[in-house]
Amino acid sequence: MYREGYGLHASCGILFNHESERRGENFVTRKITQWVAGFKNWAERQGLDTNPENFEFDDDNIYGNGESYPKLRLGNIEAFRDWGHAEDYVNAMWLMLQQRDPDDYVIATGETYSVRDFLIYAFKYINIEEEDYGKFFLVDSRFHRPSEVEYLRGLPNKAEKRLGWKREVSFE
C-alpha cells in the first residue's frame, strides 16, 4: 500500500454521513432542518403556532392568515443512512492519529434511520406529530438520485475496540 511504500504514518478513516450546522444546505438533513426552522419562523410571523389546524394545504403550499409558504420537497424518503455527528467523527480522527501504527477504520454509528425517520424527529421538534407531518412536505421525483443506495450502515467495531472511540451524540 501507499503508506507502507513511502513509510508514511497515515491512517484512513472511512467516514459515514456526519452532520453538523456546517453541513451544506443541499444535503437532505440540512434541507429538512432549514425548512422546519423557516416554517416555524414564518408561522410565528403570521401569529400562529405550528398546529396543523391553523393552516390550509394544497398540493404545493401551506396557507395561514392569507399568506403562503411552500411545502418541503424531497426525493426518496425511504433511504436509510448511518448518521453521526461531525464532532464525534473528528474525535475519532484525532484518536487515529494518536496510534503508534497507522491503520484503516470505519467511523460510523452502526445504526440506520430513514429520511422519513429524520422528518418525523424534525417535525416533532416544532410540535408537529407523526400523524400530521405528511401534510407539510411532498415527494418530488426530480429530487430522486439516479443511482440511489437504499441502505447504508457502517460497522465501527474496529474503531471502538482499537481506538476506544464511542460516539457521544445520538440521532435524537
Predicted segments with their positions:
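C-terminal substrate-binding subdomain of Rossmann-fold SDR/epimerase-dehydratase oxidoreductases
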Residues: R23, V28-E172
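Proline-glycine-enriched beta-turn/loop adjacent to the NAD(P) cofactor-binding site
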Residues: F16-E19
